[in-house]
């Protein structure tokens, strides 16, 4: 600790000291609040609203509003906010992250800033990780808000459009991060302002903020539609990977690395990548030629075969890096992704880039079509749009730097209401998995015999089922809580604190539900209270009996040492390990935790296995004897820090690339919204039309050029064939030899204006305006979709620019900007061409066309939180080479040579120029 910190205290201590003053103010108001009748207390809400409407600052009413909310909670929920919860509430109100331990009452704490900020009438979003928690918290806390005169809504995926609008128009809206993000994207795809559901993004309180803003920040939200069908190709390519062999070892430029066993491909588990060797390329080409997929003598890297190599790599990754019951499960003839952080099934989500189809081919299930992106956004860019953002979690301090760097959110560690009594024991490291599971079984048996509840955290469904099998053989009753049955997870977790309870849970399944020592009787009490057949006296007696039974069980568990946590493997993030430990020792309860590891575990095998194995061999450790030493724990923590730093780099790089698309997204969505809100777009259409025809004219009649350079015949032909305008500029020049080019352009614009007005006259200005708006929206949407695909292709190959001494990020920004300019020109051309060439006979035709345009965008739509594949550090997102960084300081020089139509496109996509940027040029 530095001298300055000792004198002035840390930033955290200074903030807490500042908030303590306000806590004293709130506590001083408590006696006065207790004296108020229910009606007088409820009348405070409209009073606060009025004061805010008159211009009073929201911070000035904070002490009084918090005091009102606390008093209302005492009366309605029979729960009083602790002082530390008041501090947490202030932390959230000031747009920071509150780190509070498990069981410290984050849900209740959030009511304070939510109530205060909802008084503005602009809406507050409370964001949770799943629908169950959103529904539970909205019902639970909604009674408090309702009593105080505020409305509460729940935004879930299965509710209809009208219900969503009601939810968003409530003062407080609970929902999941995915649903809030998808609603934003959907709102920017509507064809009528009345179809929007969201209001302006004012204030969001994010529960489990580390899970949402960090773990899921590498996976963009994507709305997609079906692209062309490659089912047959996936099936054929699926036969190739089993014919290829893995190469062990790899030659390195420094000569240290050597090939131990030659093979056709190399696998890098750390980077989650597979690469073909030279021999592998040749072998794959021979196999594909025999299959008839590759022409005789052709190369996989020919421009015409670019889709073939894309499919081959997808199949290789599916076979070598993605494993059943670890990365996915097969259910109802479908491949369902397993969330690597929570172990939950991510139903409806699909890996992108053809990987999901490759896994489907591998498993022999029905292959669903590839998708085309219609709209996408990352959580980073979505949540940064809120005027004020706050979050709460039990574990944020390890990621405080990232929260500050990416979101500008400061992390405040809130002191515990009662001191933590949990004992975190030293890791035990075994040579093999068998020894590790044997030691865990002994520990679980010991706890079971003493009546101590155990929660075992696993990193995959496969491990949880393996451990379940071991416990079944030992005749130990237990519950398995994994992604295959998460509907029951809250119920199982709530009872995981009963004596002798053994619960196996994948990672953080059941997060958000407290484990109460002795079990949770709240649900049974609710059933008794809801039973109208019982008198009040009988209800009280039965509830009392339940309470006494619970107290007895609670005391029994406390005497046995509280909840014991067993970790079967260290996660690559220290935070996830801390979350598992944090399930024990809530509210000052006793508890303990221990991680059992083996050298076969993924993290140890990849990062620290050789070092630890060398230590064990040197010490001549006997079979079944663990290492329990600080040096090993430090090695593991060092490995975790490396992975965390790498993952942070990936997220930061992803954000820097997505910021380019985000700036463009804002422009497109803003223009789209202006279009929706404009009733008559004829002025805009006129401006576009005149611009397009002026550009067309200048292509054939350059400014300040001689008459000999004009190509009026070609221009006349294009006007007649492409634009259906029967007007000859060549004839005009022949009739008036002295006419200037400016006068000719003016004449052309008069003719096009007249053709346009003739169309409008057939159906009337009002009807045609709706059609024009529909055409513009449809053109913006379709070209934006194509642009997103072009950006994806650009990003996939951009890392190669590092080898040409160029900074890939700068190159990406420059080319993305050029593509955006080309897209805007394409939109203008498409709109003007449609409006000028459409044939209209009646108003009914125009109404039908308008309806068709509005419907075109909603067919075959899928919603994915597309797995960006967080483990794969894509080369394009990692700093390519040292040369690239040197190139960053060099001025940008356009050195692009003249490209032939059939040459590979210089953007790096691998396509022919005429099929890529040449199509846009």
From Swiss-Prot:
Entries under Pfam families matching the protein: P-loop_SecA (PF21090), SEC-C (PF02810), SecA_DEAD (PF07517), SecA_PP_bind (PF01043), SecA_SW (PF07516)
Stored PROSITE patterns: SECA, SECA_MOTOR_DEAD
Highest taxon, organism lineage: Bacteria
Enzyme Commission numbers on file: 7.4.2.8
Gene3D superfamilies: Helical scaffold and wing domains of SecA, P-loop containing nucleotide triphosphate hydrolases, SecA, preprotein cross-linking domain
Keyword entries, A-Z: ATP-binding, Cell inner membrane, Cell membrane, Cytoplasm, Membrane, Metal-binding, Nucleotide-binding, Protein transport, Translocase, Translocation, Transport, Zinc
Enzyme class: translocase
Family matches, as CDD domains: DEXDc_SecA, SF2_C_secA
Subunit structure as annotated in this protein's UniProt entry: Monomer and homodimer. Part of the essential Sec protein translocation apparatus which comprises SecA, SecYEG and auxiliary proteins SecDF-YajC and YidC.
Classification via PANTHER family: CHLOROPLAST PROTEIN-TRANSPORTING ATPASE, SECA INNER MEMBRANE COMPONENT OF SEC PROTEIN SECRETION SYSTEM
Biological function: Part of the Sec protein translocase complex. Interacts with the SecYEG preprotein conducting channel. Has a central role in coupling the hydrolysis of ATP to the transfer of proteins into and across the cell membrane, serving both as a receptor for the preprotein-SecB complex and as an ATP-driven molecular motor driving the stepwise translocation of polypeptide chains across the membrane.
Name of the molecule in the record: Protein translocase subunit SecA
